[in-house]
Regions:
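Pocket-lining segment of extracytoplasmic ligand-binding domains
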Residues: 1-51, 56-57
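Segments of small-molecule ligand-sensing domains
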Residues: 42-114
Length: 114
């Protein structure tokens, strides 16, 4: 990113209170080098990312999208520094903002994640 920004550390009891109060918040680290001139990691918090769809989307399509991401997980994690610490097991249960789609559940069960 070419932006001239300096991420700041956001920690402390107020931040921990936010994290404890909502499953969709988590501690996060912005890796050094994410922004031009950023020499150190920045410890902060953020919203957990979730891919959300409608239950009106065909189950087979959702199944194929989830399968493509999970079967190419190492490449997926390289697409953005924020993805680098993702773990498959956490992605299907930790801080979900919507129920899992039946197509996703089918894939997770097929590969033994559920």
């Amino acid at each position: 990113c070419a932006a001239k920004a300096s991420p700041i550390n956001l920690t402390g009891s107020e931040v921990q209170g936010l994290i404890d109060g909502a499953d969709y918040y988590a501690k996060a680290v912005i890796p050094a080098g994410t922004y031009t001139g950023q020499k150190k990691d920045a410890t902060t918090f953020g919203v957990k990312a979730t891919v959300v769809t409608s239950n009106m989307v065909e189950s087979d399509l959702v199944y194929l999208v989830v399968k493509a991401v999970f079967e190419n997980f190492d490449d997926f994690r390289k697409q953005h520094p924020a993805f680098s610490s993702l773990k498959k097991e956490d992605m299907i249960a930790d801080g979900l903002s919507a129920p899992l789609h039946e197509g996703a559940v089918r894939y997770y069960k097929e590969v033994g994640l559920m």
